[in-house]
Structure formats: C-alpha cells, structure tokens
Amino acid sequence: MTKISKIIDELNNQQADAAWITTPLNVYYFTGYRSEPHERLFALLIKKDGKQVLFCPKMEVEEVKASPFTGEIVGYLDTENPFSLYPQTINKLLIESEHLTVARQKQLISGFNVNSFGDVDLTIKQLRNIKSEDEISKIRKAAELADKCIEIGVSYLKEGVTECEVVNHIEQTIKQYGVNEMSFDTMVLFGDHAASPHGTPGDRRLKSNEYVLFDLGVIYEHYCSDMTRTIKFGEPSKEAQEIYNIVLEAETSAIQAIKPGIPLKDIDHIARNIISEKGYGEYFPHRLGHGLGLQEHEYQDVSSTNSNLLEAGMVITIEPGIYVPGVAGVRIEDDILVTNEGYEVLTHYEK
C-alpha cells in the first residue's frame, strides 16, 4: 500500500474530504521536496480522489518542478492570499493537530470553507514508523558517519582540552566527510558533568581518570542518526566503572531481546530491571529509547508504558543510562533496525 493510499484510507475512515499536511518533514516524506518556509505557507493537500496539490512560495516553484513531486503546484507571491488561488469547499479536513497553529486553522476555515476537522497525525506517524529500503540505507549511512564522529572526538581527547573544543573539532572535521548538519546539538561532557542527562558542553577541562560522554548524530540525505558512547580517559573511580558495566549489561540484554512481535515496554523493562536490581534504579530517569528517521526523536518510544509491538522495518534507539551526581554519568546508545529475524545494530563504535 502506498503512502497516499494509506492517507486516502484514513480519509474514508473518518469520512473526510482531504488532508492538509504542513510539517516540512512530513511534506518532504510525501513529495520528495524539502523546504523551510519560515512564516510562509507551505502545505500539501491530499484529496480523497488521490489528487495532490502543493502550496508553496512562487520563488520555489521551479525547484518543486525539479523534485520527484508530480502533483499540482500552487505558487503564490508574498502579496497574494494562497487560498484565493485555489478556491475549494472542503466539508471535513484532516490536519496535523500537533503542528497546525490556531491562526492557520482559522485561515483554513475561511479559505476552504471548512466545517469540521479531524486528525491525521497518527496515520502519518505509523507510516513513517516502518522504513523503506531506501530510508534504511540512508539511516545506515548516517549511523556510519556518527561512528566516525565518535572516532574523531576520541582521538582529540587530551588533558586540559575543554568540552566545547572537542565539540567544535568533531563538527568541523566531519564536514570533510560531506556532513553539513548534525541531528542535534553535539554533547560532550566530562566526568560528573555527564550526570546531567542533557547537560550543555562548556569550558570544563578534561582531567585524567574520568569518563567522557559523547552524544551525537548526523543527518545524511534528510535522515538522522543518534548514538552515545561513554569513553574512559585513564582509570575512572571504581564506582564509575561499576556503573559503566551495569549500563553496558542493560543495553546488551535489551538489544538481544529485540525481534518483531515483542512489546516495546518489555524491552524497556529488561534494561530497567537490570539497573534497578543493581541498586541504581532511581538514577535511570528516562525511557530506554525512541524511534529514529527523518527526526532524531520520532514515533515510537521505547518506554515502560508502550504496549505496541516491534515490527520489521522500525529503527529505534536503545540508550540506558545511570546518572549519579558527584560521581559519574554513563549512557550507551545504539541505533537498531528491527529485521524479520530479529535486529541489526547500525552503530558500531566499540564499547
């Protein structure tokens, strides 16, 4: 079943006339055309008969024509009302309720004479949850480049270097490999500074005998990677090394349980139980992982409350962590493809 036919099925299920998609990444997912329109309207209209209409600034029309998109294009000037160029009466319209602003919704009511709205968010999330072979190949390459980032960062470690200096070195050096954008702000944290799960790199200088936490990802052809390694610099304290070994055991055990048909919450429980049994449960304050694709965090989440089942074609992260203030912060994260037989680990830097 194609992406568009899945949307049409949802239109029929909700007795709606069309779907209105405005999240730039979702528009790209359906059209193959990527734009960051800022305050301008950029939207895809999918009608029940399968017709697709892309609304975009007129200055982008030629780029759209050169893209894989084959539907109708409505290009508008900044001084024009886009809706006046494509007058429609749409009784019920499905929207991304998690994204669309109230102001845009009011424009739809007046522009398309919309009487009622439905939600298309979950349908799109479910579509994006299962990756095509092309998407998987791009994520695999993004993961390979993330491995290279860790290698670059580790090779730059030396006593006295600051966290920000390591971040800058990674992000500048990886450009030599064709990377123009990171998935998110690169995180490099030294010692007990890593006890803050989402800490911000600063001017802290590296000392001997502490751990260094790297959390980073790159974007390759619009698709993200996201990995974490915690690396020894010298010989950290006995407790810090004990924490590392517990996190590694939790991650390894969780990954080995991955296969289609297993509830996501069961994977979380495996890692969480190991950490709790070793006395560090209160220091593991977040879910085990999340979906990965066009965004570094996307549907679904690997959490203790998610009863949905793993399916072949999903790409998820597994990232247990223990964060003890004043002692250490350790997280280990890999990108995992769910296969028909079980799983494939896409990130490979040594642990």
UniProtKB/Swiss-Prot annotation:
Keywords: Hydrolase, Manganese, Metal-binding. The keyword Iron does not apply. Its cofactor is Mn(2+). CDD domains: APP-like. Mn(2+) 2 binds at residues 215, 226, 333. Binds 2 manganese ions per subunit. Mn(2+) 1 binds at residues 226, 290, 319, 333. Gene3D superfamilies: Creatinase/methionine aminopeptidase superfamily, Creatinase/prolidase N-terminal domain. Disulfide bonds: none annotated. Belongs to the peptidase M24B family. This is Uncharacterized peptidase SAOUHSC_01816. It comes from Staphylococcus aureus (strain NCTC 8325 / PS 47).
